Amino acid sequence: MKKKTSLSEEDQALFRQLMVGTRQIKQDTIVHRPLRKKITEVPTRRLIQEQADASHYFSDEFQPLLNTEGPVKYVREDVSHFELKKMRRGDYSPELFLDLHGLTQLQAKQELGALIAACRREHIFCACVMHGHGKHILKQQTPLWLAQHPHVMAFHQAPKEYGGDAALLVLIEVEEWQPPELP
């Protein structure tokens, strides 16, 4: 294939005259890749869907049978009762706290669902839910909702340093973390 030049012979001669004593630069070091935006945040649509899925389990019509005497507590059938004892003694310290003060029941359900979804996503085993005293509506409903969720392993009235009888410590079942497979 024949090279086409767009410069006249005079211009080419002038260019060569000006370039006397220079040498061509070698590009042998770095190849620049085009900049791409890294996606580090989970898309908000997915987060909203996770929260909605997690709050789907909470029903006001179904009321699980919980012991009404003594502190509020619950343990799933396949979980050891020793976990309740460890929660009561304060062996677990919560990594996430949820404050339900001032929320409606619908908002509280959504926030509980969001808390459980966040714990599973971040591999957090123990969380604290502060329902407060108030008119005792959320104080009564929160344990009933938590007992219905399949990812809640156990909950117990929180020790005094985490809110006492105005809060619950919740153990959440998280998936085992596995390192990614190498190719």
Swiss-Prot record:
Supply the alphabetized keyword list: Endonuclease, Hydrolase, Nuclease, RNA-binding, rRNA-binding
Give the enzyme's EC designation: 3.1.-.-
What is the main EC category here?
Answer: hydrolase
Q: Which InterPro entries match?
A: Smr_dom, Smr_dom_sf, SmrB-like
Q: Which GO terms describe its biological process?
A: rescue of stalled ribosome
Question: Transmembrane ranges?
Answer: none
Query: Keyword Chloroplast, does the record have it?
Result: no
Q: Which residues form the Smr domain?
A: 98-173
Q: Does the keyword Acetylation apply?
A: no
Please give one Gene Ontology molecular function term for this protein: RNA endonuclease activity
Q: Which family does it belong to?
A: Belongs to the SmrB family.
Sorted alphabetically, which HAMAP family does this protein's record hold?
SmrB
Role noted for this protein: Acts as a ribosome collision sensor. Detects stalled/collided disomes (pairs of ribosomes where the leading ribosome is stalled and a second ribosome has collided with it) and endonucleolytically cleaves mRNA at the 5' boundary of the stalled ribosome. Stalled/collided disomes form a new interface (primarily via the 30S subunits) that binds SmrB. Cleaved mRNA becomes available for tmRNA ligation, leading to ribosomal subunit dissociation and rescue of stalled ribosomes.
Alphabetized PANTHER family for the sequence: DNA ENDONUCLEASE SMRA-RELATED, UPF0115 PROTEIN YFCN
Kindly state the subunit structure of this protein: Associates with collided ribosomes, but not with correctly translating polysomes.
Name of the molecule in the record? Ribosome rescue factor SmrB
Give the organism the record lists: Salmonella paratyphi A (strain AKU_12601)
State the encoding gene. smrB
